[in-house]
Amino acid sequence: MRTLQNLSDIERRLVAELRRRIDTEFTDIEFRMTVFGSRARGDADPDSDMDVLIEVDVEHISFADKRRLRRIATDVSMASGIIVSLLVVDQGILAERGDFSVFENVREEGIAV
């Protein structure tokens, strides 16, 4: 199983800052955060983005909240120089629709944050 130690120093700092910012702004919402894609696999190019899945209970998050999440991701991207591609999904989607290729990738290569 891959862990945060598989990421580079800058990637770990990016993920830590993203998590810290989300935790700070969303104290009342529980969520899971997973890094997946080329950066999680360790085969990223210098220009590769960082794919991040956020699983939340959609009953507790509004469209405005999703916009705030994307703004945080943009801020962290600008500060780090690595583009964060954020995917916000309902917490049950992996179990229900796990056969979608993106969710297969999350299960196979994901790094929980």
Feature map (PLM): residue ranges:
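Catalytic core of pol beta-like nucleotidyltransferases
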Residues: 1-32, 40-46, 57-113
